[in-house]
């Protein structure tokens, strides 16, 4: 026994890796596996506890490595291993015997902080990324094979379209040569007997049209060739990926290769970032050159005309923009801010809803199917055009052989078209309908993002003008990239606006499909949505000659009938605030130029615009449940200038544009907003005045007396506001000047609701300067017995009132049902004399109330805002009520996905900060309750700390009320009497303490803080780093290889784009220096070039650029929302399909200058060129035979594709043959990159093993040195391998 122990001890000492491993190898080995030691150690400890009931077999022993990791010694075979020999008794032997999440004997799961979980096969001495228990890898391979089969059919469609287009080009060239020959001969022996053929002018015009047609067909042929090259390259990449994965053992990468691929992807990503900067700089240079060419062309045409690139004064349109908050006192600004916060919260909720709808919609759409449907429809159209071209050929001068060939070609085309028409295309129509619905949701989302950004900027402007704080960053505006320490996400690789071409016009495509396939069902289909009828010109059309996507000028909203044009489904949808914007998407598509020009700063809008957005949206939300006409719903109360048709003749010469137009009006109509924005000229012709509730009000100011005369004349159709019975009810009008109105004036009560005539005049003493800062609020009140109810309101801005004139206008009344709640008016009604006396008393000085608050001058100065607003503070009960409503709303930002990136955490924190700072308040209830309950003591007094307390004898009565203590800043004067025991006065020295609303959490006052704003600007809490984002979605080697090849493809096309942009820049610079008119005309008229430079136009307003970033971020959020629906541990099929379709999508195309702008001009008069022209004339018979042969060959190659759109192939798919493309018509696919572009966009060679490196996928063939370690290594009999546990 001692000998055995000694032998075991010696053997253990001999086999211990700490003594056998060289020092260098030991350190390298320890560093390589240091990250997984703890987890594997825990695993083996659990294994020891689990195997404690079973003894070790004979000849086995347990030892620990220098780092504490347990391994096992087989003394019989003289080997060491990580596997416990007792696993054969406790673990299943095969995967079929496993239950739940068990792994069979010899398998181990480990975790790497960079690549996540991976698996070790100790028996086969290998590691792999895939989970061996899941069959996701097999599903991926089958999906890849199916897609390659479908992509092969799509490629055949493109090639057949190329053949048909080439045949059309041949016929067009033949027609052009016929016309040239006829024009050059200029004799009666022409090929046609028509006398019009002999007119030189007509011949010249026909020749011009034929030349343009040939040029256009060549351009279309170039586009198709580029599409074929993009598709072929993508399919070749997918084939190479599949072959590379299948060539490996088990189709899996080991961990070392995964690390190498990951490092290579990060390096390529850095190259992409630097290359994108180079591309952006080139595009900005192209914009400058294009503008210079435009100036040169305009100066050549007419030097007297002003350049359109000069600055245009829009002072008349932006006169409303000024800082409206400057003329608003604290109370009105507080109310305006609360309304804006409420709107912002509602918009955020609506955006979340749209994102969820888009995430649900994407699941019903097959990735890449839209491109296939487009190719199929365009192929049929090309055949139709070729058939029309053949039918238009005159056969009189043709030989019999030519006639026979033409007839055969026509017959073949007719048969192909008949088969296409008779095919079942219901699926195509349904898919296009899904895409159209998706486009509609995207348009709604874009409008929602615009409105949200406008409100966000509005809130930031409030923050700069008041003491309320708002976070400097918002999730909607921040678009930080993922951390460089983490791997690239799906959205970083595959969601790139420059990686794919412009989106397809789905509406145009669906119209084509309806015309081709479903002409007999057009009446049963839903009409196209008005928004989609006016796609922007930035979207690419299906063909250069397509006229289906032409823009139409926007019409006036007053000419739009929603009930007639919108579908019932659209009418039943929940309306959004976007319907009330100046360019509402439900009414008319906003033109890009006027909006960007007028609204360069959306947060400078007047408060009336925001009120319109809220009130009009509430109007539609309450009335869109039933299919109502817009004419039935009353417009919002307006203070807009009436049309010239409403003004008397003596007032037509007066203009109100010079008056102060800063307004505090509650709302304006859609017409006034759109009219002010310059989109259209407001029209009165279609205003349904007879169905609106209106009030006629007269205003006149007497300067000598200092009195405003208000005349409440009559009303019209008040029954539109009163839903109950008008029997035993009366109505009267009540008016008050807001804010800080002591009194209100009221008319007599009448029983007529249809056309009541009041004829009541009141005099309100007020100075002119104060009058221009107020607004007149007129409310319509009904009385039924002792009960009074407000049924409508009108608010008129006195800023637009001209004191020199007397006005008498009709104003629309907003119904009270569109406002959440109205509090009863507690302001007593008085006569004009009483009002004058009250105003006079309020203007009297009161020196007894002037008390010095603090000797600190800085504190007094910084408290001016709160001091001026002390009389506008709402009562404490109202604040507590609003706080309770805030708590009831709950947070807006719900966690979307458990595996968000670090930047998403920051954005969520910004969202919470913004929401907490903004405070979600019920705007209408706060506004009206505050304005009606407010009581003014003094108008202009300094800091007041005195107040009237309830006498002690009234404590018994006050017990019935709320006994909660009232904590208020001493700089505020409470508007209600409280007991001294309930009132706690605090003298705050910070400039922001006294104005902080109840929605902001209190923070400790920091003495000596920067600018004494410790409560406004406080440091954000550090982000928690304890949360680990461990994804449970399986990731395979095929996913990793696809990601790597996608990065290489993006880099390849980026170098291609940079080279083309550099070439285009050089050519345009030379043309600009030489003042070449042809190149200048091409740069201005080419639509593709215009779309390209529009992406980087510095003249584009920052809001549009921010909107593009928001759309990009929203796409990522939609992807995350869709991922949350995938069950935990299940593969995401849609994401994988999007990965493989990424390779066959066409990237951003850069236009190339044509080598020849025009074909050689034909001279119809000179006959010296007759012989030369005859030599250029083609043999018509040979041309027709060649066309027929090519058509038959292409038809045989692509027969019955519509019946088998997704033909799956079993086994490996053969390599793609080369496309049948004419060399003369094929442009250079990969021009050499310029040295600057190559140095900026090509990644440096790195000494890493890259098993996924593709020679054809890299932009530059930089040699990558293979990592080799030829150093002398010592060999031992037994060395513990830390991965496999076998002898090395």
Swiss-Prot record:
Gene3D superfamilies xrefs: 2.20.70.10, C2 domain (2.60.40.150)
Stretch list, region Disordered: 1-60, 541-560, 841-869, 890-912, 942-975, 1224-1269
PTM sites of type Phosphoserine: 992
Biased composition (Basic and acidic residues): 942-966
Biased composition (Low complexity): 35-49, 857-869, 1224-1267
Record family assignment: Belongs to the WWC family. KIBRA subfamily.
Identification of the protein by name: Protein kibra
Organism: Drosophila melanogaster
Gene name in the database record: kibra
């Amino acid at each position: 026994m001692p000998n055995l122990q000694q032998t075991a001890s010696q053997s253990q000492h001999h086999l211990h890796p700490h003594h056998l491993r060289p020092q260098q190898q030991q350190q390298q080995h320890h560093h390589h596996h240091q990250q997984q030691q703890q987890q594997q150690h825990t695993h083996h400890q659990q294994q020891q506890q689990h195997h404690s009931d079973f003894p070790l077999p004979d000849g086995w022993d347990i030892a620990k490595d220098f780092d504490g990791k347990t391994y096992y010694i087989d003394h019989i075979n003289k080997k060491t291993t990580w596997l416990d020999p007792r696993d054969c008794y406790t673990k299943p032997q095969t995967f079929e015997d496993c239950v739940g999440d068990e792994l069979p004997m010899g398998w181990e799961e480990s975790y790497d902080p960079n690549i996540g979980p991976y698996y070790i096969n100790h028996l086969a001495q290998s590691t792999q990324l895939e989970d061996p228990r899941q069959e996701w890898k097999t599903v991926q391979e089958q999906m890849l094979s199916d897609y390659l089969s479908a992509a092969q059919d799509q490629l055949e469609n493109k090639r057949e379209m190329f053949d048909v287009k080439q045949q059309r080009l041949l016929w067009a060239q033949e027609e052009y040569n016929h016309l040239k020959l006829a024009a050059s001969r200029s004799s009666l022996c022409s090929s046609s007997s028509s006398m019009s053929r002999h007119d030189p002018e007509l011949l010249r015009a026909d020749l011009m049209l034929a030349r343009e047609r040939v040029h256009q067909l060549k351009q279309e042929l170039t586009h198709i060739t580029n599409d074929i090259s993009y598709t072929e390259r993508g399919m070749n990449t997918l084939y190479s990926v599949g072959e590379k994965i299948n060539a490996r053992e088990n189709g899996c990468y080991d961990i070392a290769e995964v690390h190498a691929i990951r490092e290579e992807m990060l390096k390529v990503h850095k190259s992409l970032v630097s290359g994108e900067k180079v591309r952006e700089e080139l595009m900005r240079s192209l914009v400058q050159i294009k503008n210079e060419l435009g100036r040169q062309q305009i100066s050549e045409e007419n030097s007297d005309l002003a350049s359109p690139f000069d600055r245009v004064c829009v002072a008349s349109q932006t006169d409303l923009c000024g800082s409206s908050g400057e003329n608003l006192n604290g109370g009105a600004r507080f109310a305006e801010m609360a309304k804006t916060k409420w709107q912002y919260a509602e918009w955020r909720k609506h955006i979340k809803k749209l994102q969820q709808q888009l995430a649900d919609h994407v699941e019903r759409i097959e990735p890449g199917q839209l491109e296939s449907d487009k190719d199929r429809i365009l192929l049929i159209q090309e055949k139709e055009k070729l058939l029309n071209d053949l039918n238009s050929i005159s056969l009189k001068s043709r030989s019999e052989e030519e006639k026979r060939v033409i007839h055969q070609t026509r017959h073949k085309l007719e048969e192909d078209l008949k088969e296409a028409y008779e095919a079942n295309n219901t699926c195509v129509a349904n898919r296009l309908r899904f895409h159209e619905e998706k486009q509609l949701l995207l348009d709604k989302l874009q409008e929602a993002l615009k409105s949200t950004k406008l409100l966000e900027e509005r809130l930031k402007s409030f923050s700069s003008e008041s003491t309320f704080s708002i976070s400097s960053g918002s999730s909607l505006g921040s678009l930080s990239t993922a951390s460089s320490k983490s791997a690239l996400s799906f959205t970083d690789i595959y969601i790139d606006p420059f990686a794919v071409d412009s989106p397809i016009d789905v509406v145009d495509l669906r119209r084509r499909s309806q015309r081709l396939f479903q002409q007999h069902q057009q009446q049963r289909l839903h009409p196209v949505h008005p928004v989609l009828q006016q796609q922007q010109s930035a979207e690419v059309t299906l063909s250069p000659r397509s006229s289906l996507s032409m823009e139409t000028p926007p019409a006036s909203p007053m000419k739009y009938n929603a009930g007639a044009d919108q579908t019932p489904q659209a009418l039943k949808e929940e309306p959004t605030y976007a319907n009330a914007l100046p360019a509402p998407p439900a009414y008319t598509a906003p033109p890009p130029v006027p909006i960007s020009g007028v609204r360069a700063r959306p947060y400078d809008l007047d408060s009336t615009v925001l009120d319109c957005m809220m009130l009009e949206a509430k109007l539609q939300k309450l009335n869109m449940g039933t299919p109502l006409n817009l004419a039935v719903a009353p417009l919002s109360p307006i203070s807009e200038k009436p049309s010239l048709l409403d003004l008397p003749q003596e007032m037509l010469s007066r203009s109100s544009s010079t008056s102060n137009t800063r307004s505090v009006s509650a709302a304006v109509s859609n017409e006034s907003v759109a009219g002010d924005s310059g989109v259209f000229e407001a029209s009165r012709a279609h205003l349904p005045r007879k169905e609106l509730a209106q009030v006629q009000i007269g205003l006149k100011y007497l300067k000598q007396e200092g009195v405003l005369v208000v005349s409440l004349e009559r009303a019209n159709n008040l029954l539109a506001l009163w839903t109950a019975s008008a029997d035993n009810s009366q109505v009267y009008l009540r008016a008050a000047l807001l804010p800080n109105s002591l009194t209100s004036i009221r008319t007599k009560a009448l029983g007529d609701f249809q056309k009541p005539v009041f004829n009541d005049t009141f005099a309100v003493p007020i100075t002119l300067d104060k009058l221009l800062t107020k607004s007149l609020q007129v409310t319509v009140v009904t009385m039924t017995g002792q009960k009074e109810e407000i049924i409508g309101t009108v608010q008129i801005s006195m800023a637009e009132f001209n004191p020199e004139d007397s006005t008498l206008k009709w104003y629309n009344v907003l119904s009270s049902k569109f406002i959440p709640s109205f509090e009863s008016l507690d302001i007593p009604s008085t006569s004009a004399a009483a009002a004058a006396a009250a105003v006079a008393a309020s203007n009297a000085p009161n020196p007894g109330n002037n008390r010095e608050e603090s000797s600190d001058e800085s504190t007094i100065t910084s408290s001016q805002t709160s001091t001026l607003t002390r009389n506008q503070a709402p009562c404490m009960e109202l604040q507590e009520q609003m706080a309770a409503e805030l708590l009831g709303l709950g947070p807006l930002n719900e966690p979307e996905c458990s595996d968000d990136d670090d930047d998403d955490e920051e954005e969520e924190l910004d969202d919470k900060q913004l929401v907490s700072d903004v405070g979600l308040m019920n705007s209408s209830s706060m506004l009206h309750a505050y304005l009606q309950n407010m009581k003014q003591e003094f108008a202009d007094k300094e800091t007041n700390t005195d107040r009237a307390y309830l006498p002690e004898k009234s404590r018994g009565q006050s017990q019935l009320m709320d006994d909660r203590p009232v904590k208020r800043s001493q700089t505020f004067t409470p508007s209600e009497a409280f007991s001294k025991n309930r009132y706690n006065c605090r003298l705050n020295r910070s400039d922001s303490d006294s104005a902080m609303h109840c929605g902001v959490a209190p923070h400790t006052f920091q003495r000596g803080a920067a600018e004494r704003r410790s409560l406004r600007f406080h440091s954000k809490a550090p982000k928690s780093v304890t949360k680990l984002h461990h994804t449970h979605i399986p990731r395979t080697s095929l996913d990793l290889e696809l990601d790597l090849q996608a990065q290489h493809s993006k880099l390849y096309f980026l170098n291609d784009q940079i080279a083309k942009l550099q070439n285009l820049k050089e050519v345009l610079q030379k043309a600009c220096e030489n003042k070449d008119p042809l190149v200048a005309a091409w740069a201005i008229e080419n639509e593709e070039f215009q779309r390209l430079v529009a992406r980087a136009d510095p003249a584009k307003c920052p809001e549009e650029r921010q909107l593009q970033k928001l759309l990009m971020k929203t796409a990522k959020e939609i992807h995350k929302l869709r991922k949350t629906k995938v069950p935990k541990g299940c593969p995401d099929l849609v994401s994988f399909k999007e990965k493989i379709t990424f390779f066959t999508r066409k990237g951003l195309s850069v236009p190339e200058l044509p080598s020849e702008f025009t074909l050689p001009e034909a001279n119809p008069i000179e006959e010296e060129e007759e012989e030369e022209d005859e030599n250029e004339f083609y043999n018509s018979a040979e041309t027709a035979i060649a066309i027929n042969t090519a058509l038959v060959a292409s038809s045989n190659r692509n027969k019955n594709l519509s019946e088998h759109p997704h033909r799956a192939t079993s086994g490996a798919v053969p390599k793609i043959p080369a496309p049948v493309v004419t060399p003369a018509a094929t442009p250079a696919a990969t021009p050499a990159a310029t040295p600057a572009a190559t140095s900026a966009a090509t990644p440096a060679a790195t000494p890493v093993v890259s098993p996924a490196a593709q020679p054809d996928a890299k932009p530059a063939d930089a040699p990558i040195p293979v990592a080799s370690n030829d150093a002398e290594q010592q060999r031992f009999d037994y060395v513990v391998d830390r991965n496999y546990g076998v002898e090395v």
